Amino acid sequence: MIKKKNKKRYTEVSALGKYIPMSTHKARRVIDQIRGRSYEETLMILELMPYRACYPILKLISSAAANGIHNMNFDETSLIISKAEVNEGPTAKKFKPRAKGQSYPIKRSTCHITIVLRDISLNEKYEEYIRKPWALLEKSNETEIRKRN
């Protein structure tokens, strides 16, 4: 079996929230509204939406942005949400006591939310390097030659 190595993209940061006690359908309703938008626009949208799923998603987006700003020196204004997905987590099964000694089963669903932010200001340079890696090397060699002369 041949394994393809993924080239790590240094223009992306992510945050993963696991076991969030919420239905995947309710979380996807919010995630679909913010996918592909800028970071600042997303914060405004999430603060004004009346859904309970907005708060954990807002915390995850803020965490991903903090990762990018602290670890990668990204700029807040150039961040966009490149990937946002909600996956189903494990379901906790409980019993609710009812009248006359009976009980009804209750399913408490959880979900895993993944947010990936991309810095679009660095993306152009990265794509240029992937297409023509020698072009950037030639530019750096020209500047060294100019400095010597």
UniProtKB/Swiss-Prot annotation:
Coiled coil: none annotated. GO terms for molecular function: rRNA binding; structural constituent of ribosome. It comes from the Eukaryota. Gene3D superfamilies: Ribosomal protein L22/L17. GO terms for cellular component: chloroplast; large ribosomal subunit. GO terms for biological process: translation. Keywords: Chloroplast, Plastid, Ribonucleoprotein, Ribosomal protein, RNA-binding, rRNA-binding. Belongs to the universal ribosomal protein uL22 family. HAMAP family: Ribosomal_uL22_B. This protein binds specifically to 23S rRNA. This is Large ribosomal subunit protein uL22c.
